[in-house]
Design a protein with these regions (language model features):
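C-terminal segments that line or cap access tunnels to active or ligand-binding sites in enzymes
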Residues: 307-411
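Active-site-proximal substrate-binding core of FAD-dependent oxidoreductases
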Residues: 233, 476-486
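A glycine-rich dinucleotide-binding beta-alpha-beta segment and adjacent secondary-structure elements
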Residues: 164-173, 396-458
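Mid-domain catalytic core of redox enzymes
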Residues: 229-354
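N-terminal glycine-rich phosphate/pyrophosphate-binding loop and immediately adjacent elements
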Residues: 2-123
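Rossmann-like flavin
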Residues: 100-184
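Helical element adjacent to the flavin cofactor pocket in flavoenzyme catalytic cores
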Residues: 189-251
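A conserved FAD-binding loop/helix module that cradles the flavin
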Residues: 453-479
Length: 486
């Protein structure tokens, strides 16, 4: 018998949160802890958005995006989630950059990175320190039109190798590149340089289950397999949402209408405007501005599971490798790219498992159009090619690893789009101009807010979590004032 995933929900809530990415989860938790009646809806059968996982036969557990985040994640988790979540965050000390311009092994903290730039790349220490100082002094509200590439050239003129070392890991972290505003680079890079790269010990499955348990403990109603089909607006005010239970086999359940005072959309900001709400509910100028927002790049992953009982040597935690002569966003995002990052998950990732297990995930940046335009036959062939190239590349670090892999599969921008509904399969939300549109939604429609990955600086694990709190704080104040006025 098909299951109605919406069974038992009430007809009205203070806030409905659409989507359970880290921004949605954290925003929902903030609002629930502050006494608001919150309903969180996720269309997928797993919570977490891109911060999720999947299992495969053979005891494999694959993390979608648990590759690394800055130390600021510890502070945010301590502040907005139970202490045990923050206490499970551990440092990844082995990052590697291997390409025709360099072979670097680093802990990716400021001291080590500085020594590499000075000793290996022969950059004056004063110039490196001046660069760091410049990044720290950057302010989001400054009217600074300088691009990241222009900033690199100012401090390290003609040094394409240095530019590559500085830019490539951030391109993987949030999809940005040298033509984006320098502020988007400065904020993110400075966060990483604080104390290095960190991850969650226990895996994404453990993390998200703890977060969902905390949400329920704070009185938040959470439902998965629930697709929000639209936000209802009357007289420029949010009045409710429409949602349908799904993933239930052959039976189709009716659309449910839920009343609410406010909606926190954790969807793509353009999806929110163009599909969830509808363009006709906004001013023409705002719609034009929103449609001009560029979606960020997408990504591919190749998931490789090591057989039970087999081991692999320590080759580093994050291995950035490329055959490209120099850094190029065109090459980095091409369907034929030679650039990818191996995230290696050793037994320490999930120490609670009864047996030591190893997995490797290769991540590649990608362009939506290149993958979306393929026929089904071409699509399958490209996925197979990508898998083979990643295994061959991994063999250069671990000879014979092919024989130790008993599961391999690929995800593409199409996969991201299917499971997250994110426009053009973007893995990192929008380019910088999307942040202004996101922040001004409630100026257009009372009670409508957004906390999805946006503007580059609000992308990635830390950015989206913090943006969830920023937006939820605005909502909390608005709901409080609204209640006082009654």
């Amino acid at each position: 018998m098909a299951k109605d995933w919406l069974e038992g929900i009430e007809d009205e809530y203070d806030v409905v949160v659409v989507g359970s990415g880290l921004g949605g989860l954290t925003g929902a938790n903030y609002l629930a802890k502050n006494g608001h009646k919150v309903l969180l809806l996720e269309h997928h059968y797993q919570f977490g958005g891109l911060a999720t996982w999947f299992k495969r036969p053979g005891g494999h557990i694959f993390d979608i995006s648990l590759h690394g985040f800055p130390y600021g994640m510890v502070k945010s988790c301590r502040k907005y989630w139970p202490k045990e979540i923050a206490d499970s965050i551990h440092q990844l000390k082995d990052g590697r950059f291997i390409n025709p311009q360099m072979n670097v092994w680093t802990s990716f903290d400021r001291e080590d990175f500085t020594n590499i730039l000075v000793n290996d790349f022969k950059v004056d220490r004063e110039k490196v320190e001046a660069f760091y100082t410049h990044l720290r002094q950057m302010n989001f509200y400054d009217d600074n039109t300088q691009t990241t590439g222009e900033m690199f050239e100012e401090f390290f003129p003609g040094r394409s190798d240095v530019h590559r070392l500085l830019m490539e890991p951030i391109s993987y972290a949030n999809g940005s590149h040298v033509d984006d505003p320098a502020i988007t680079y400065g904020i993110v890079f400075s966060n990483f340089m604080s104390k290095g790269v960190f991850t969650f010990q226990g895996g994404t499955d453990t993390l998200i289950k703890k977060m969902v348990a905390e949400l329920k403990n704070n009185g938040c109603e959470v439902r998965k397999c629930a697709l929000v089909e639209g936000v209802d607006v009357d007289d420029k005010k949010v009045v409710g949402i429409r949602v349908r239970s799904q993933n239930t086999g052959e039976e189709e359940f009716p659309v449910r209408s839920i009343k609410c005072k406010a909606v926190l959309s954790n969807a793509n900001v353009r999806n929110t405007i163009e599909y969830l709400v509808g363009e006709n509910k906004f001013s023409e100028d705002f719609v034009a501005e929103a449609k001009a927002v560029r979606n960020n790049t997408s990504s591919c992953q190749v998931y490789m599971g090591i057989k039970k009982g087999e081991t692999i040597p320590n080759i580093g935690d994050l291995v950035f490798t490329s055959k490209a002569a120099e850094y190029s966003i065109g090459e980095l995002t091409s369907i034929k790219t030679s650039s990818h990052t191996f995230s290696v998950y050793y037994p320490e990732t999930r120490p609670h498992l009864s047996q030591d297990r190893y997995t490797v995930v290769a991540s590649l940046n990608a362009q939506w159009d290149e993958w979306n335009d393929l026929s089904e036959e071409e699509y399958q062939a490209e996925k197979a090619r990508m898998c083979e190239e990643c295994v061959s590349s991994l063999e250069s670090f671990i000879p014979g690893v092919r024989d130790k892999i008993d599961h391999i599969e690929a995800a593409t921008p199409r996969t991201v789009n299917y499971y997250t509904k994110s426009m053009q399969g973007t893995s990192f939300g929008t380019k910088f101009e999307g942040l202004k549109v996101s922040m001004e939604l409630s100026d257009q429609i009372e009670g409508l807010y957004h906390a999805g990955s946006v503007g580059i600086i609000m992308s990635g694990w830390l950015g989206t979590m913090n943006y969830g709190v920023i937006t939820a704080n605005k909502m909390d104040k608005w709901l409080y004032e609204k209640a006082k006025a009654v």
